[in-house]
Amino acid sequence: MRQLAFAFCLMAAPLAAEIEAARDMMEEGRFEEAYEALWPAARSGNADAEELIGVMYAMGLGVPRDDQRAFEWYLRSAMKGHPGAQSGVGWYYEVGRGLPAPDLVRAYMWYTLSAIGGDPDAAISLEEVVKKMTAEEIDKAHILVEDYKVWMYPFR
């Protein structure tokens, strides 16, 4: 069992280094290279890489801006508990960009999950979305938060 854990750690370290290298490329404006570096990790389900691919599609960094693809990449990462991606999904639901219409109930849910996960900006977004909601919508959102929180953050 220890050997398996050790092997996993050895495999995870290079992946983390690749993602950090891709972040550096993004900061340097080398977006196409960053996309190529992130793509394998994102395709294999790494939440950090998925979130960064979402950012790239949302902002048109190295790829054509595509709100639907951005939302899908954010959602993949968010479902794995990535707080930044959860805020991204919340924002898309709040404004409705790339979606049929805004959905404040789901925006509230995702911002709340993001805040639970540790995103410091999520609380600010949550305050803003609450101003647009009815009491009934907030009640519905609380139900969704409880449903998702149980399996996404079982120890919080």
Functional labels for PLM-detected ranges:
Residues M1-A7:
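Sec-dependent signal peptide recognition
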Residues A12-P14:
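N-terminal signal peptide c-region/cleavage motif recognized by signal peptidases
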Residues I19-M25, A37, A41, L52-M59, ...:
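Hydrophobic face of amphipathic alpha-helices that form TPR/SEL1-like repeat modules
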Residues R30, R43-A47, M59-L61, D66, ...:
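Short helix-capping/linker turns of helical repeat alpha-solenoids
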Residues D121-R156:
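Terminal, low-structured helical/coil segments at or just beyond the last alpha-helical repeat
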